[in-house]
C-alpha cells in the first residue's frame, strides 16, 4: 500500500492502539493534521489551547490509564512549548510519545521560519528522540518510539518529522517493535539477590518498606499487599507511590518526604532494614544524605540500574521488574507481625494527630477555611473513589497528605519537576482516559493561572472535570519558606487575582465561590453531584502553613511539627 508519510503517522498510531491524541496544529505539521481529519472517526484529536497543555494532558492520560500518552505540535515554538511537559514526564517516568513537525529537509540548519533544533533541545529530557527526514523511516521509528516509551522504566520519546517526509509517498507496512538489540530495558532477575534480600528481611527486628511509583508502573499492587501482609512490615509511600496501597490498609503508615508524616520520616533513622520498592531516593525523601538511614541495611528493588547506589548506598540491589521480583520474594519471607515496631509508628502518629492533623482537618482556631478541611470535605463526597489531580505548592502537599485513596492510579501530580500549571490539563487527560472515574483537580491560585486557558479545552470537549482552586492570594509554598527562613520578607509572593468564577463562567463552566466554612459542605456536594464540569473557588486561610516539614538540607530526624 503506497501512502504519504503523514497518513503513515496516523496508521502507525492506530496500529499501536492509540485512539486519543492532544495537540495544536501549525504549518510544519499540517500534512499530519490533514490526515487526522480523514481518520477522525478512528482517532480523536483534542485541540488544547497551548502545547504545554497537550503534553500535560497526555501525561494525565498516561498516569490514569497506564497507556502511552500522545501529544502533537508543530515546529519552532510549538515544539519548544512541549518541553516543560516532556521534562516533567521524564523525571516522573511517564510513558509519552510526542510528535513534532519540522521544516523541510532542504531547509534544516538555515534558520528557516519556525525552525528550532528540537532534537538538541529535548535530548536531556527525553528517554529517546529521533528526527525523521525520509517518509520510509516513519513505521520503524514510531514502532521503536512506543516500545521505548512503555518498556523498562517508562518515559517520554520525541519524534521530529520534516515536512517533506510527511508529503512523500512510500510502500507502507507496520510491525510493532518487540526489542532493540542495543537496548535492554528490563534487567534479568538475579534470584541469588532475591534470596539475600529475603534473608535480611527475615532477620530484621525493625524492617521498614518505602514504596514508590514503580509499584504502579509495574502493576505490582497485589504483590506489595501480599508482601506486607505476610511479613507484617510497616509500609510508607512516596508522593508518586500514593494510591498503590489503599489509604486505610492497616499496614500503611503514611507518606515519607519533606511534608510527609512524622512517624515514617523519623523512624527511617531507626529501622534496621530499609526496603525500597520502585523508588529513587530523591532529595525530598532523604533530606540530608549524610544522615539518612545510616544505621540501616538498605535493600533496593529497582528496574533502572542508574538509580542504584546513586544517592543511597545499598546492601542488596535487586535489579529487575518489581512485580517479578516481589513474586519471587514473597515465598521466601517468614510470616511475622512486628507488633512492638508498629506501636512506635502508632505513637508517632498520635503525636502528629494531636499537634497537626486534628486542627488542620477540623480547625478550632477561629481562622478561615483550611486547605486540609477542604480536602477532607472532598473525601467525604468522593468516598475515596475519585482520581485526585493536584498542581504544585502547599495545596499539593495537603492533597497528598489527606486524600483518601481506595484504588491505584488515583493520584496524578507533578513530583520530580514540580511544574506549576500541571493539574488543569492533566485532569483533562485523566478524565478522558478514565471517563468512568470522577476526576478532581485541586489547584492553587498561582498555578491555576499558568494554564488557565485550558478551560477552553474543557468547554470545547465538554469533559466533566471538577476544578477546585484553593485561593490564599499568595504563592503559598514560597511564602511559607519566606516566613520560616527569610524573616517574613514576602518578596513577590502576594497575588492580586482576577474574578476566577467570572472567568469560568465565561467558558460556560458552572462556578461557585466559598468564603464561609458553613457553606463548604454544600458546595463540595453540589460539585461532586454535577454531571458536567464544575469550578469551585475556596477562599482559604491566607497564611495556612503545611506541616510536618523537613527543612531543606536537614536530616529527616529534624522534621518539624510547627
Residue ranges of predicted features:
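Active-site nucleophile and cofactor-binding loops and adjacent substrate-binding regions
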Residues: 24-26, 45-56, 71-78, 133-134, ...
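Generic enzyme active-site microenvironment
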Residues: 158, 300, 389, 442-443
Amino acid at each position: 500500500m503506497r501512502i504519504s508519510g503523514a497518513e503513515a503517522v496516523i496508521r502507525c498510531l492506530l496500529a499501536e492502539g492509540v485512539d486519543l491524541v492532544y495537540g495544536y496544529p501549525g504549518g510544519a505539521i499540517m500534512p499530519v493534521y490533514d490526515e487526522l481529519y480523514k481518520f477522525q472517526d478512528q482517532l480523536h484529536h483534542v485541540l488544547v489551547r497551548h502545547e504545554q497543555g497537550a503534553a500535560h494532558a497526555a501525561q494525565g492520560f498516561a498516569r490514569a490509564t497506564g497507556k502511552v500518552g500522545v501529544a502533537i505540535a508543530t515546529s519552532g515554538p510549538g515544539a519548544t512549548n512541549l518541553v516543560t511537559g516532556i521534562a516533567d514526564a521524564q523525571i516522573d517516568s511517564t510513558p509519552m510519545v510526542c510528535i513534532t513537525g519540522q521544516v523541510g529537509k532542504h531547509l534544516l540548519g538555515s534558520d528557516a521560519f519556525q525552525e528550532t533544533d528540537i532534537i538538541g533541545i529535548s535530548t536531556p529530557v527525553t528517554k529517546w528522540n529521533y528526527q525523521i527526514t525520509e517518509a520510509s523511516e516513519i513505521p520503524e521509528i514510531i514502532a521503536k518510539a512506543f516500545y521505548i516509551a512503555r518498556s523498562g522504566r517508562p518515559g517520554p520519546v520525541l519524534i521530529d518529522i520534516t515536512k517533506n517526509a510527511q508529503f512523500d509517498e512510500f510502500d507502507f507496512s507496520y510491525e510493532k517493535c518487540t526489542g532493540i538489540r542495543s537496548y535492554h530495558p528490563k534487567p534479568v532477575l538475579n534470584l541469588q539477590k532475591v534470596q539475600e534480600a529475603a534473608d535480611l528481611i527475615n532477620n530484621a527486628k525493625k524492617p521498614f518498606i518505602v514504596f514508590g511509583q514503580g509499584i504502579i508502573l509495574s502493576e505490582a499492587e497485589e504483590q506489595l499487599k501480599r508482601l506486607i501482609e505476610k511479613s507484617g512490615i510497616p509500609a510508607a509511600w512516596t508522593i508518586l507511590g500514593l494510591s498503590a496501597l489503599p489509604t486505610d490498609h492497616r499496614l500503611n503508615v503514611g507518606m515519607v518526604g519533606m511534608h510527609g508524616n512524622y512517624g515514617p520520616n523519623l523512624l527511617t533513622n531507626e529501622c534496621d532494614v530499609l526496603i525500597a520498592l520502585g523508588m529513587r531516593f530523591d532529595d525530598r525523601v532523604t533530606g540530608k544524605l549524610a544522615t539518612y538511614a545510616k544505621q540501616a541495611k538498605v535493600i533496593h528493588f529497582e528496574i533502572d540500574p542508574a538509580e542504584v547506589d546513586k544517592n543511597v548506598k545499598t546492601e542488596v540491589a535487586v535489579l529487575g521488574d518489581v512485580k517479578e521480583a516481589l513474586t519471587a520474594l514473597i515465598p521466601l519471607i517468614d510470616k511475622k507481625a512486628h507488633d512492638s515496631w508498629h506501636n512506635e509508628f502508632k505513637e508517632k502518629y498520635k503525636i502528629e494527630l494531636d499537634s497537626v492533623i486534628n486542627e488542620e482537618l477540623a480547625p478550632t482556631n477561629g481562622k478561615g477555611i483550611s486547605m486540609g478541611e477542604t480536602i477532607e470535605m472532598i473525601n467525604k463526597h468522593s468516598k475515596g473513589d475519585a482520581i485526585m489531580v493536584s498542581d504544585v505548592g502547599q495545596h499539593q502537599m495537603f492533597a497528598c497528605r489527606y486524600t483518601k485513596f481506595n484504588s491505584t492510579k488515583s493520584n496524578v501530580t507533578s513530583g520530580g519537576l514540580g511544574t506549576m500549571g500541571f493539574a488543569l490539563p492533566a485532569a483533562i487527560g485523566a478524565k478522558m482516559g478514565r471517563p468512568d472515574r470522577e476526576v478532581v483537580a485541586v489547584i492553587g491560585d498561582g498555578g491555576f493561572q499558568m494554564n488557565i486557558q485550558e478551560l477552553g479545552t474543557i468547554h470545547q470537549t465538554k469533559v466533566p472535570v471538577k476544578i477546585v482552586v484553593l485561593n490564599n492570594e499568595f504563592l503559598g509554598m514560597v511564602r511559607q519558606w519566606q516566613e520560616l527562613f527569610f524573616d517574613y520578607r514576602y518578596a513577590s509572593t502576594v497575588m492580586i487575582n482576577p474574578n476566577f468564577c467570572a472567568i469560568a463562567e465565561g467558558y460556560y463552566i458552572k462556578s461557585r465561590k466559598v468564603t464561609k466554612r458553613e457553606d463548604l459542605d454544600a458546595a463540595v456536594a453540589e460539585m461532586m453531584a454535577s454531571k458536567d464540569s464544575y469550578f469551585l473557588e475556596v477562599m482559604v486561610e491566607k497564611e495556612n502553613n503545611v506541616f510536618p516539614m523537613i527543612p531543606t538540607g536537614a536530616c529527616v530526624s529534624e522534621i518539624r511539627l510547627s
